[in-house]
Amino acid sequence: MTEPKILTRGCGKVKISLWGGWLARLERSVRGAVPACWAFYLPVASVLVIPRIICEAPTAARLPALIHHRASGRLSLIPAGYVLNLPELIAPISDDMKAVDAVIRGRLDSEVVLIRTIADYIIGAGGKRMRPAMVLMMARALGYQGDHHHLLAAVVEFIHTATLLHDDVVDESDLRRGRETANAMFGNAASVLVGDYLYSRSFEMMVEAGSMRIMQILSEATTVIAEGEVLQLLNVHDPDVSQERYLQVVRYKTAKLFEAAAQVGAVLAGATAEQEAAAAAYGRHIGTAFQLVDDVLDYSGDAQALGKNVGDDLREGKPTLPLIWVMEQGTPAQRELIRNAIQTGDADFAAVAEAIRATGALEHAQQAASAEADIARRALDILPISVYQKSLLEFCAFAVNRDR
């Protein structure tokens, strides 16, 4: 990673207090207005830590969440919007990821040409591959030396891809990862059936791993994900959804597969019960953070960078966290605007975006994501320090500071 420039001009006096050997707080007295929050970059021992207390600025579009340590011996400040480079984060497992891609390509083989065509289309669209990377990274972080993690990482990617195929049909989406969705290209029926094929193929591959515990984790995950899909369906066009009810959907629909991916990696490595629980907690909370940032990006991101239409959640009548916050904290007029937008899926996007901005809804969602990432980071304290543990920590930074 290219080290960011030191940014101190105009920031006034910086005070740092240490607690328990870790940087716990950054206090700042500011001369004049500062148009962004700052995260801090403390080079120590190549370990990444998330601060519990951060400085605030009302005009910040994105809040800082993380600090990154390297062995250069000095403190730097970096903008809150600083985005980590995902390929660099997964560099320690780059060979493993290539092996996983080979497994994916091989296991997509089918005598039915349409299955290969659709599966190749959606898998070939790319994506972050965070879930399979999590299997690999957690297994390596706990000392795994075999190669079954390639198979299981591919299983996790197949499950994820199946959910995308089904999601796009349910949501009637037409754009994903910067190109037409599979259902837009090949029709709803074919997309659903190929999703079913990928689920079936993933279970076939699970059996090869020879672990009932791993099968239990992944089969439970697929059940919970399906429950999350149904819960989300019940929430659509309902403006009275609470934050807790929404977060239940996030935990079921999105975070559960992150949780399963990390947990499978731990089990494969022969983790203790305590390590397995910590791995599951890490995945669950980083998955939640990931989805909450998606909520933010749906109202603040760029369609080309995201690879999907900005405002899709609103058009689909989905009450995500920014909208729920306006319903709870907005003026009567703002609440009525959002209520109508959720109920109809047809509203003035600019007016909705202004209500979200005025109530600080994006900042609230970003802070919630940062809090989840902090919990994920602390779950990794049980792991031995290694390049793999460091990358898992850096995933926390990527999850909350990404722009796509």
Regions flagged by a language model, labelled:
Residues M1-K13:
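Extreme N-terminal basic, low-complexity initiation segments
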Residues T2-K5, P43, I50:
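Intrinsically disordered, low-complexity, charge-rich segments with an acidic bias
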Residues L7, W38-L42, H69:
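Short hydrophobic targeting helices and cationic amphipathic motifs
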Residues T8-G10, W22, P51:
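Short, low-complexity, intrinsically disordered N-terminal modules
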Residues K15, E27-A33, A45-R404:
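All-alpha prenyltransferase/terpene-synthase fold signal
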Residues W19-W22, W38:
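Tryptophan (W) side chains
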